[in-house]
UniProtKB/Swiss-Prot annotation:
Pfam families, per database record: RPE65
Protein's UniProt name: Torulene dioxygenase
Cofactor notes: Binds 1 Fe(2+) ion per subunit.
Function in brief: Torulene dioxygenase; part of the pathway that mediates the biosynthesis of neurosporaxanthin, a carboxylic apocarotenoid acting as an essential protective pigments and leading to orange pigmentation. CarT mediates the cleavage of torulene into beta-apo-4'-carotenal, the aldehyde corresponding to the acidic neurosporaxanthin. Is also active on other monocyclic synthetic substrates such as beta-apo-8'-carotenal and beta-apo-10'-carotenal to produce beta-apo-14'-carotenal and retinal(beta-apo-15'-carotenal), respectively.
Induction field: The expression is subject to photoinduction and is transcriptionally co-regulated with the genes of the other carotenoid biosynthetic enzymes.
Catalytic reaction(s) noted: torulene + O2 = 4'-apo-beta-carotenal + 3-methyl-2-butenal
Provenance organism: Fusarium fujikuroi (Bakanae and foot rot disease fungus)
Main location: cytoplasm
Binding-site list for Fe(2+): H239, H291, H361, H570
GO biological process assignments: carotene catabolic process; carotenoid biosynthetic process
Keywords: Carotenoid biosynthesis, Cytoplasm, Dioxygenase, Iron, Metal-binding, Oxidoreductase
Pathway per the UniProt entry: Carotenoid biosynthesis
Top enzyme class: oxidoreductase
Enzyme Commission number: 1.13.11.59
């Protein structure tokens, strides 16, 4: 089929329907059976290094710095009290953080050095001792040999962290720890250092784990309660939002109870002070699993998808995992949006709804001021997200499905034609802001869908030019799928103005991860830069950092390791000090 081979493909709106239908054809042909991807998920090792990687091609010297990535690493624990412990859901893989030091040398050849470190050794030790996993997980299947009493008792044990989702640098307002600040002076190979005051790893729990930027050693944990005493709930978003101009950090805190409460807050980058922008406690505003949200120039916007928690959130304490705590998908359960003012202390200023759906990742949001037919100035808000028709994708990330153990891929995705819901659509909504605050929690207003770009012309794990966050923009980079594997199998640059797409595809078995766009210093064009992506070669069980031209998606170079590195979730590039 048109996109099944390796190369770079230029596609237009006219190709969308055919390319989307080819995903279905590839899935029905069970193409994943010839695409090995176990190396991306299983038997992954720690390499504290640093180890020099083999560079082929070029990486621009101006991209010097460090590319950090984090995600699940080890997925099994050998020799526990009950034998081998297997992690069942990818999101619960034991955290491992990776650092790729990109170092320009005097002779003009860039060097790339690699190191990694596990971030959940305490939890692994606990599993080794007990033979089962205690504490809150995303989707770990319950051990049938563990009794109710033992499960209940784990609710009262100290929390063991598995921070494996996203990386946050230069986080304001966090407490300083003199014992750990000293470690930040350690340098990498050839005296390499990055320009950051701190580095944290997050998850969808309110705690974030500080790590040493050079050694990757896990250090102290900070919770949102340390930022402000009212932020006492257990849930939040892995993806905090940052104002690209001020550096201010935004997120929300979700507390369960008789009436669940959302608190949207801002941490001032200059002062480190935390301000609660809005407190929303209403039975018509349900608690839900959310992984990301939206930021515009003047607003913080929360979209509550159909992934509602049962028992007003309290079922999480009974089930001990997120998946089993969520209500089944209901197409009548619309997405509910909360618009919060972030400039003038107005709190909740608007609400609206959109059709039932689910999403992991927001892409971007922005505002436009327009004049209506009467000459009155109005503000339109635009929201872009990688939207799924329902919640089927969540259980598609069980390791058995990802690695096709015992034909699990076909059993899951072919049942009830679930494969029709495996690929996201880049969706844009437009909402006209009321001229006066109308915090109506009946969600009677609605937004208009104004753009939809299907896979593989857009995909998951989306990233943009970092300085365009919350502002009008044109390009998004993402990891897409053609139906050739159980994960993603392509990288795509999507032009939101024209709906054109440039799609990079590697050889069979080469599974890419999240693309990270690094702008060229001083560049004016939004796509003038490079794209980094970690690619796992499942055929040879190796990995490499791929460097693509941000304009054309053509390969510039790659830095190869002679071992596999976990596909992981998210990363950031920090410039050299």
């Amino acid at each position: 089929m048109a996109l099944n081979g390796p190369g770079v493909y230029h596609r237009t709106r006219e190709h969308e329907q055919k390319d989307a239908s080819d995903i279905t054809k590839n899935i029905l042909a069970e193409s994943w059976k010839s695409w090995p991807n176990e190396a991306a998920f299983d038997r992954l090792e720690e390499h504290r290094g640093p180890l020099r990687l083999t560079l082929k091609g070029t990486i621009p010297s101006w991209a010097g710095g460090s590319l950090y990535r984090t995600g699940p690493g080890q997925s099994r624990v050998e020799d526990t009290a009950r034998g081998t412990h297997f992690t069942t859901h990818w999101f619960d893989g034991f955290a491992q953080t990776h650092r790729f030091d990109i170092i320009p040398s005097e002779d003009g050849e860039t060097q790339v050095w690699y190191s990694s470190r596990r971030q959940a050794d305490e939890w692994i030790a606990d599993v080794k001792k007990k033979g089962w996993r205690s504490g809150m997980t995303f989707g770990q299947k319950a051990d049938p040999c563990v009794g109710i009493f033992a499960k209940v008792m784990t609710l009262f044990e100290p929390k063991l962290g598995n921070h494996n989702v996203a990386l946050l640098a230069n986080v304001p307002g966090v407490p300083k720890d003199e014992k750990t600040e000293v470690l930040n002076g350690v340098t990498g190979p050839l005296g390499h250092r990055v320009n950051t005051s701190n580095l944290f790893v997050s998850t969808d729990y309110t705690g974030i784990r500080r790590i040493d930027p050079s050694t990757l050693q896990p250090l102290a944990e900070t919770t949102q309660y340390d930022l402000h005493p009212s932020l006492s709930g257990p849930c939040s978003c892995s993806h905090a939002q940052r104002d690209p101009d001020s550096g201010d950090l935004f997120n929300f805190n979700l507390a369960f109870g008789r009436v669940p409460t959302y608190r949207i807050f801002r941490v001032d980058a200059a002062s480190g002070e935390t301000e609660v922008l809005a407190t929303i406690s209403d039975l018509n505003v349900p608690p839900a699993y959310m992984h990301s949200f939206f930021l515009t120039e003047n607003h913080v916007v929360i979209c509550i998808p159909a992934s509602h928690y049962a028992w007003r959130g309290l079922k999480t304490q009974w089930e001990g995992n997120i998946i089993d705590s969520m209500k089944p998908f209901d197409k009548e359960r619309k997405c509910k949006w909360l618009v919060v003012d972030r400039r003038h202390g107005k709190g909740l200023v608007a609400t609206f709804s959109t059709p039932a759906a689910f999403f992991f990742h927001s892409i971007n949001a922005f505002e436009k001021n327009i004049e209506d037919e009467d000459g009155t100035e109005q503000t339109d808000l635009f929201f872009d997200l990688a939207k799924y028709n329902n919640m089927d994708i969540i259980k598609g990330f069980y390791y058995d499905v990802l690695m096709d153990r015992d034909d699990a891929t076909k059993k899951y995705w072919f049942k009830n034609d679930r494969y029709k819901n495996c690929a996201p659509t880049l969706t844009r909504y437009r909402f006209r802001l009321p001229s006066a605050p109308t915090p109506d929690t009946t969600f009677s207003a609605s937004a208009e869908q104004v753009l939809a770009i299907p896979s593989p012309h857009a995909g998951e794990l989306p990233t943009i030019h970092p300085l365009r966050n919350g502002k009008p923009y044109r390009y998004v980079y993402s990891a897409s799928l053609r139906g050739l594997t159980t994960s993603v199998d392509a990288l795509v640059k999507t032009d939101l103005d024209t709906s054109e797409a440039f799609i990079w595809t590697g050889p069979e078995g080469h599974t890419p991860g999240e693309p990270v766009f690094v702008p060229r210093p001083g560049a004016e064009a939004e796509d003038d830069g490079i794209v980094f992506s970690l690619v796992v070669d499942g055929v040879n069980e190796k990995a490499y950092i791929l460097c693509l031209n941000g304009k054309t998606m053509e390969e510039l170079g790659r830095a190869e390791a002679d071992f596999a590195i976990g596909q992981g979730f998210h990363g950031i590039h920090l410039p050299a000090a």
